[in-house]
Amino acid sequence: MLPSHRTISRSVLWVCACLILEGLLHPCQSSAQNSLQQQVSLTISAAADLSLAFQELGTLFEKETGTKVIFNFGSTGQLAQQIEQGAPVDLFAAASIDFVDGLERQGLILPDTKALYARGRITLWTRADSPLRIERIEDLSRPEVKRIAIANPDHAPYGIAAREALQSVSVWEAIQSKLVLGENIRQTLLYAETGNVDVAIVALSLSRQGEGRWVLVPQELHKPIDQALAVIKGTRHEQETRRFAAFINGPEGRPIMRKYGFVLPGEESVK
Protein backbone atom coordinates (compact mmCIF):
# COMPACT_ATOMS: atom_id res chain seq x y z
CA MET A 1 0.00 0.00 0.00
CA LEU A 2 1.26 3.41 -0.89
CA PRO A 3 1.82 5.85 2.03
CA SER A 4 -0.92 8.35 2.51
CA HIS A 5 -0.58 12.00 1.49
CA ARG A 6 -0.62 12.90 5.18
CA THR A 7 2.28 10.51 5.89
CA ILE A 8 4.33 11.99 3.06
CA SER A 9 3.63 15.52 4.27
CA ARG A 10 4.72 14.63 7.78
CA SER A 11 7.91 13.06 6.45
CA VAL A 12 8.72 16.10 4.37
CA LEU A 13 8.04 18.41 7.27
CA TRP A 14 10.24 16.31 9.52
CA VAL A 15 13.15 16.41 7.06
CA CYS A 16 12.74 20.16 6.57
CA ALA A 17 12.67 20.72 10.30
CA CYS A 18 15.88 18.73 10.72
CA LEU A 19 17.58 20.68 7.97
CA ILE A 20 16.51 23.99 9.48
CA LEU A 21 17.65 22.89 12.92
CA GLU A 22 20.98 21.75 11.48
CA GLY A 23 21.44 25.11 9.81
CA LEU A 24 20.67 26.93 13.02
CA LEU A 25 22.96 24.82 15.15
CA HIS A 26 26.04 24.93 12.94
CA PRO A 27 26.38 28.73 12.85
CA CYS A 28 26.06 28.80 16.63
CA GLN A 29 28.68 26.10 16.97
CA SER A 30 30.95 27.87 14.50
CA SER A 31 30.42 31.16 16.30
CA ALA A 32 31.32 29.56 19.62
CA GLN A 33 34.45 28.04 18.12
CA ASN A 34 35.44 31.36 16.59
CA SER A 35 34.92 33.05 19.93
CA LEU A 36 37.13 30.51 21.66
CA GLN A 37 39.75 30.77 18.96
CA GLN A 38 39.63 34.56 18.70
CA GLN A 39 43.12 35.88 17.98
CA VAL A 40 44.91 37.46 20.91
CA SER A 41 46.55 40.82 20.19
CA LEU A 42 49.45 42.16 22.26
CA THR A 43 50.30 45.85 22.49
CA ILE A 44 54.03 46.43 22.74
CA SER A 45 55.45 49.85 23.57
CA ALA A 46 59.00 49.77 22.23
CA ALA A 47 61.85 52.21 21.79
CA ALA A 48 62.17 53.60 18.27
CA ASP A 49 65.57 51.97 17.71
CA LEU A 50 63.74 48.63 17.75
CA SER A 51 61.36 49.44 14.91
CA LEU A 52 63.03 47.31 12.25
CA ALA A 53 64.11 44.41 14.46
CA PHE A 54 60.83 44.13 16.34
CA GLN A 55 58.68 44.27 13.22
CA GLU A 56 60.58 41.26 11.94
CA LEU A 57 60.31 39.56 15.32
CA GLY A 58 56.58 40.27 15.49
CA THR A 59 55.93 38.75 12.08
CA LEU A 60 57.80 35.58 13.02
CA PHE A 61 56.12 35.36 16.44
CA GLU A 62 52.65 35.72 14.94
CA LYS A 63 53.43 33.06 12.34
CA GLU A 64 54.61 30.61 15.01
CA THR A 65 52.01 31.28 17.70
CA GLY A 66 49.00 32.91 16.06
CA THR A 67 49.26 35.80 18.51
CA LYS A 68 49.14 39.20 16.83
CA VAL A 69 51.65 41.83 17.95
CA ILE A 70 50.85 45.53 17.63
CA PHE A 71 53.75 47.94 18.15
CA ASN A 72 53.81 51.47 19.47
CA PHE A 73 57.29 52.81 18.73
CA GLY A 74 58.56 56.03 20.23
CA SER A 75 60.91 57.70 22.66
CA THR A 76 61.50 55.54 25.73
CA GLY A 77 60.76 58.39 28.14
CA GLN A 78 57.50 59.28 26.44
CA LEU A 79 56.39 55.64 26.29
CA ALA A 80 57.12 55.24 30.01
CA GLN A 81 55.03 58.31 30.71
CA GLN A 82 52.13 56.85 28.74
CA ILE A 83 52.29 53.69 30.84
CA GLU A 84 52.36 55.76 34.03
CA GLN A 85 49.18 57.45 32.82
CA GLY A 86 47.42 54.12 32.32
CA ALA A 87 47.94 53.37 28.63
CA PRO A 88 46.80 49.79 27.81
CA VAL A 89 50.19 48.17 27.21
CA ASP A 90 51.23 44.54 27.61
CA LEU A 91 55.02 44.81 27.27
CA PHE A 92 57.48 47.69 27.55
CA ALA A 93 60.79 47.37 25.68
CA ALA A 94 62.91 50.35 26.69
CA ALA A 95 66.16 51.69 25.26
CA SER A 96 67.41 52.09 28.83
CA ILE A 97 66.93 49.91 31.88
CA ASP A 98 66.61 53.08 33.97
CA PHE A 99 63.08 53.65 32.68
CA VAL A 100 62.06 50.06 33.44
CA ASP A 101 63.47 50.48 36.94
CA GLY A 102 61.37 53.63 37.29
CA LEU A 103 58.18 51.76 36.43
CA GLU A 104 59.16 48.98 38.82
CA ARG A 105 59.47 51.45 41.69
CA GLN A 106 55.90 52.54 40.96
CA GLY A 107 54.64 48.95 40.96
CA LEU A 108 53.70 49.06 37.27
CA ILE A 109 55.55 45.97 36.02
CA LEU A 110 55.76 42.30 36.94
CA PRO A 111 59.21 42.33 38.61
CA ASP A 112 60.17 38.78 37.65
CA THR A 113 59.82 39.66 33.95
CA LYS A 114 62.39 42.48 33.95
CA ALA A 115 65.28 41.46 31.72
CA LEU A 116 68.07 42.90 29.63
CA TYR A 117 67.65 42.05 25.97
CA ALA A 118 70.32 44.14 24.21
CA ARG A 119 73.01 46.77 24.43
CA GLY A 120 72.80 49.51 21.82
CA ARG A 121 75.48 51.42 19.94
CA ILE A 122 75.45 54.88 18.38
CA THR A 123 76.77 55.92 15.00
CA LEU A 124 77.50 59.04 12.97
CA TRP A 125 75.23 58.86 9.92
CA THR A 126 75.37 60.86 6.68
CA ARG A 127 73.64 60.47 3.35
CA ALA A 128 75.51 58.51 0.70
CA ASP A 129 75.60 61.58 -1.54
CA SER A 130 76.92 63.89 1.17
CA PRO A 131 80.19 65.69 0.34
CA LEU A 132 81.13 65.47 4.02
CA ARG A 133 83.51 62.78 5.20
CA ILE A 134 82.81 62.26 8.87
CA GLU A 135 85.25 59.79 10.41
CA ARG A 136 85.04 60.61 14.12
CA ILE A 137 82.80 62.53 16.45
CA GLU A 138 85.26 65.44 16.75
CA ASP A 139 84.60 66.15 13.06
CA LEU A 140 81.18 67.53 13.98
CA SER A 141 82.82 70.76 15.13
CA ARG A 142 84.15 71.47 11.64
CA PRO A 143 82.68 74.63 10.05
CA GLU A 144 81.36 72.80 6.99
CA VAL A 145 79.06 70.77 9.25
CA LYS A 146 76.08 73.09 9.59
CA ARG A 147 73.34 71.03 11.25
CA ILE A 148 73.50 67.96 13.49
CA ALA A 149 70.57 65.88 14.70
CA ILE A 150 70.40 63.90 17.92
CA ALA A 151 67.43 62.44 19.77
CA ASN A 152 66.16 64.68 22.54
CA PRO A 153 68.25 63.76 25.60
CA ASP A 154 65.43 64.84 27.90
CA HIS A 155 63.57 61.60 27.19
CA ALA A 156 65.53 59.53 24.63
CA PRO A 157 68.35 57.24 25.86
CA TYR A 158 70.14 57.41 22.52
CA GLY A 159 70.07 61.19 22.80
CA ILE A 160 71.59 60.92 26.26
CA ALA A 161 74.38 58.73 24.85
CA ALA A 162 74.96 61.21 22.01
CA ARG A 163 75.25 64.09 24.46
CA GLU A 164 77.66 62.13 26.66
CA ALA A 165 79.85 61.28 23.67
CA LEU A 166 79.92 64.89 22.50
CA GLN A 167 80.80 66.04 26.00
CA SER A 168 83.55 63.42 26.25
CA VAL A 169 85.39 64.93 23.28
CA SER A 170 84.67 68.49 24.43
CA VAL A 171 82.56 69.58 21.45
CA TRP A 172 79.12 69.67 23.09
CA GLU A 173 79.21 73.39 23.84
CA ALA A 174 80.76 74.26 20.49
CA ILE A 175 77.97 72.66 18.45
CA GLN A 176 74.94 73.97 20.36
CA SER A 177 73.93 76.29 17.52
CA LYS A 178 74.02 73.36 15.08
CA LEU A 179 71.83 70.99 17.07
CA VAL A 180 68.42 69.76 15.91
CA LEU A 181 66.54 67.52 18.35
CA GLY A 182 64.43 64.60 17.20
CA GLU A 183 61.54 63.33 19.31
CA ASN A 184 62.96 59.83 18.99
CA ILE A 185 65.86 58.11 17.26
CA ARG A 186 63.81 57.24 14.16
CA GLN A 187 62.84 60.86 13.60
CA THR A 188 66.46 61.85 14.15
CA LEU A 189 67.55 59.59 11.30
CA LEU A 190 64.75 60.94 9.12
CA TYR A 191 66.14 64.46 9.49
CA ALA A 192 69.40 63.27 7.92
CA GLU A 193 67.78 61.06 5.30
CA THR A 194 65.74 64.00 4.01
CA GLY A 195 68.71 66.36 3.98
CA ASN A 196 67.40 68.61 6.74
CA VAL A 197 70.63 68.05 8.67
CA ASP A 198 74.14 67.12 7.58
CA VAL A 199 74.81 64.46 10.19
CA ALA A 200 72.73 62.47 12.66
CA ILE A 201 73.85 60.50 15.69
CA VAL A 202 71.60 57.46 15.57
CA ALA A 203 71.29 53.85 16.66
CA LEU A 204 73.40 51.25 14.91
CA SER A 205 70.25 49.15 14.49
CA LEU A 206 68.87 51.79 12.12
CA SER A 207 72.14 52.72 10.41
CA ARG A 208 72.89 49.17 9.31
CA GLN A 209 69.68 48.93 7.32
CA GLY A 210 69.86 52.34 5.68
CA GLU A 211 71.50 53.56 2.49
CA GLY A 212 73.78 56.16 4.02
CA ARG A 213 77.33 56.11 5.32
CA TRP A 214 78.00 55.58 8.98
CA VAL A 215 80.78 55.09 11.49
CA LEU A 216 80.56 53.70 15.01
CA VAL A 217 81.06 56.04 17.93
CA PRO A 218 83.53 54.47 20.40
CA GLN A 219 81.50 52.99 23.22
CA GLU A 220 83.89 54.27 25.89
CA LEU A 221 82.69 57.81 25.12
CA HIS A 222 79.30 57.20 26.73
CA LYS A 223 77.63 55.04 29.34
CA PRO A 224 76.40 51.65 28.13
CA ILE A 225 73.00 51.73 26.45
CA ASP A 226 71.60 48.75 28.34
CA GLN A 227 68.14 48.01 27.01
CA ALA A 228 65.56 46.17 29.11
CA LEU A 229 61.99 44.95 28.89
CA ALA A 230 59.22 43.98 31.29
CA VAL A 231 55.63 42.78 31.25
CA ILE A 232 53.24 45.47 32.43
CA LYS A 233 51.25 44.71 35.56
CA GLY A 234 47.57 44.25 34.75
CA THR A 235 48.06 42.89 31.24
CA ARG A 236 45.05 40.87 30.11
CA HIS A 237 47.31 38.47 28.22
CA GLU A 238 50.06 37.65 30.69
CA GLN A 239 50.85 34.19 29.33
CA GLU A 240 51.18 35.36 25.74
CA THR A 241 53.15 38.46 26.74
CA ARG A 242 55.60 36.41 28.78
CA ARG A 243 55.99 34.16 25.77
CA PHE A 244 56.84 37.09 23.51
CA ALA A 245 59.37 38.42 26.04
CA ALA A 246 61.03 35.00 26.13
CA PHE A 247 60.89 34.87 22.33
CA ILE A 248 62.97 38.06 22.06
CA ASN A 249 65.73 36.62 24.26
CA GLY A 250 65.37 33.09 22.93
CA PRO A 251 66.87 31.13 20.02
CA GLU A 252 64.33 32.59 17.60
CA GLY A 253 64.78 36.22 18.55
CA ARG A 254 68.51 36.54 19.24
CA PRO A 255 69.67 36.03 15.63
CA ILE A 256 67.27 38.75 14.47
CA MET A 257 68.43 41.18 17.14
CA ARG A 258 72.06 40.40 16.31
CA LYS A 259 71.41 41.05 12.62
CA TYR A 260 70.40 44.62 13.43
CA GLY A 261 73.61 45.30 15.30
CA PHE A 262 72.50 44.81 18.89
CA VAL A 263 74.94 43.38 21.39
CA LEU A 264 73.11 40.58 23.18
CA PRO A 265 73.28 39.54 26.83
CA GLY A 266 76.34 37.36 27.30
CA GLU A 267 78.10 38.65 24.18
CA GLU A 268 80.92 41.15 23.76
CA SER A 269 80.52 44.40 21.87
CA VAL A 270 82.51 45.34 18.80
CA LYS A 271 84.89 48.18 19.70
Regions found by a protein language model. Give the residues of each.
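Intrinsically disordered/low-complexity terminal segments and short unstructured peptides
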Residues: R6, L19, E64-G66
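Exported/periplasmic ABC-transporter solute-binding proteins
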Residues: C28-G66, I70-F73, G77-A87, A94-I97, ...
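Bacterial N-terminal signal peptides
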Residues: W14-H26
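Compositionally biased, low-complexity segments
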Residues: H5-T7, G23-P27, S31
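Bacterial N-terminal signal peptides that target proteins for export
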Residues: L2-V15
